[in-house]
Amino acid sequence: MSEGAYQRLWESSHATLQELLDQEQLLLEPAPDRERQSFQYRLASLYLHYLGLLRRFDTVYDQMVQPQKRRLLRRLLDGVAGRVLELKDELVRADLCENHCLDRVLQDFKLTPADLEVPIPKYFLLEQSTTVRERGLILAEILSRLEPVSSQKSFTGMHRTEAIILVQKAERARQGRLRATFMREIRRDEEQDGRIREDGWHKFSQGQAAVTIQKVWKGYLQRKRTQQDRRMEMEFIGMLPSPNQVEHLSIISQPCLVEDVQRLRQMEKEEEFRAAMVKAHDSLVETEGPDMKEKMKEQIRQWFIECHDLTGRFPDYPDASSGGSYSIFADKTPEQVRMELEMQMQENRKKEQEKSKEKGKDEKEKKKGKEEKAKKGEVDAVLQVLPSKCIPMICAGHEEYLNTWKNRCESIHPSQNYDSETLREEKRKEVELEIRIQVDELMRQELRKLRLAVDKEEERPLRAPKKTPGKKTGKKKEKDLTSDRSVESLYEELVISGLLRKSESVALKDYIGDFLYLGSTLSLVKKLPMPSLFDIRQNVALYAVLRLGSPDIHIMAPLIRSILLVGPSGMGKKMLVKAVCTETGANLFDLSPENLLGKYPGRNGAQMMVHIVFKVARLLQPSVIWIGNAEKNFYKKTPKEDKEMDPKRIKKDLTKALRLLTPGDRVMLIGTTSRPQLAEMRGLCRVYERILFMPRPDYASRYVLWKRMIEARGIQPTQHLDISALAKVSDGYTPGHILQAIQSVLSERRFLQLSKRPLVASEFLGQLVKLDPVYREEEESLKDWYFKTPLGKKSMKHRMDQLEAEEAKLDKEKKKRK
């Protein structure tokens, strides 16, 4: 895409953003519980449109070169990402489940499941690539020091006679195989000649022989042409992949090269802009600084005089924490300040009179409302969205675009150089704030002298606001048990003890799964739709990747400290943990019970271990703390075989450490378990704020799994391989089982035979039979457990209430008919 195309995409994105901001006002209106479906539909439509907007802003930010526009785009990108996470939280509260049936909404807006993909901003890794690389080198260096120097393997000697016998055996075997092949061919030729003699020779004339040869040859040519035409047609309509993979890869790689060139240009323009920022700041301080200082002093002196004339005393000077004099003179004249003071005094008097009247009225109205509701028996729940932290930021960015960039006459190829006038305006505000701090200090001293000279009054100390008794504000600060140690030493200690590991590089898109196409249909017939692998991937992207990727998004988004992945073995839980680390460049800490065996023994040791892990995780953000077999930390009754590792010893310290995480601490606890029934429900749900249930893959996901995993081995499926049949037969098997079957079948030897013997479905069935599937009893047990979680209970209660309401409605209709 050209620079003009990115400019047009930016403009169209702001037009869409304006429409969404208008819709936000309608969403603020509370809705009764009986209108839950329409409320969910409005939330889902907003969520979908914000996802599309996030995708477009990410594309423009990644390729826009102009540095000032990029800064605005970054704020908008973070704001929209935060709003997506807020809407996801609202959808969970409205739907009472983690997966949402959005197929009807997609159909109404003529969108595809690809539009539901959560885009991961590219700057997550690009802007911290240096940090991630340096951290990887440090980790590799520590690990190399731990590994013992591999000594040369000593091979057992072989006697010369034994070696000769071994070579002779191999050579004789080779000659025997060749002789057997040769004899097989001779025998086959003899049998063929014998059959011909028995049938007798058929004499052809020259013309008949020519016609026969032509007939066979023309038939062969026509079959070949028909097959080729059919393949071309199937490739054209997208039913078969293109055979020319080299051409396909070259087409894909060309835009990537252009994007890399654009990023190099971004770095050059950014360096120019930073140098210009320093130059503009210094220039403004020298040229306009003295005039600004004198103007501020005159304005503040005039305020002193006006207040003294109006109230008979000099005002209290605003504290620096409240903005100093800026809070009073923000684009105001002395006359406006005087009018405001008079209005404030009048309003204060009115408020005092109205408060006493309103108290009595409110109490009476509350009593009446309660009595009426009690009589009617109607206590209708209200659905309403929570106040957004991101909307003000988005509105400010959109307004800046309208005021600064919208009405500019840009050419087809807009200039990518910075705008000096806009830069000077921004720097002028910064210089003004710096000078105002200096002026405030001088004017506070001048105010003291005025009070002494005019009112003969000493300086009045500012009274601290009274604290309400019985209420504790803030949280207790964590006691630093390792204040005398550096981060580097703690980091090395964790690596040596095996608590900090190198994560494998796994992209989140490699977690393959398809969309649930019949979610709304299942809901209509009162069947509970289970999440697909697509839903699981999206939830992990929303709950973990987007939050950990950016500090600004983490601060604005609803705080989520921990998630628990629950599902049978082979569902890819560990793969998702690695994908989160890869997509965000996060450190991976392993606090699995098996990994803690023999490390940091005793009660104090466990406390120290959790403290060090969370301290390093906070200092080297982003970080992922993984606990495999998470149910063991909350065993109802510890089995005999696990008593030695004492898995419950970090339970208390883990809960305390999680509570200390605040917005801005990009640390995520991710637990994985396949047997949550063994754990105490209350403790597990207290630690893990979000629980993602991972059932067996459905037909659509299994079909995509078979196809993509075979293609990943470098093989294009042919018509001989019935993938649909494989997807049906493999019901009950996890992605791990499917991968094992593919790896077993596609050996090196089988790969070499593909040209002569194409793959067929029966080859994979033999391998699947050897594996144990996820039986229905196991999955039902996991479902029953999930519906005992807090969110699962709410969902089941809501469904029961709906069924009861429908039954009551049907009973009323039957009575009316009678």
From Swiss-Prot:
Residues 798-818 have a biased composition (Basic and acidic residues). SUPFAM superfamilies: P-loop containing nucleoside triphosphate hydrolases (SSF52540). The gene is IQCA1L. It comes from the Eukaryota. SMART domains: IQ. This is IQ and AAA domain-containing protein 1-like. The keyword ATP-binding applies. Belongs to the AAA ATPase family.
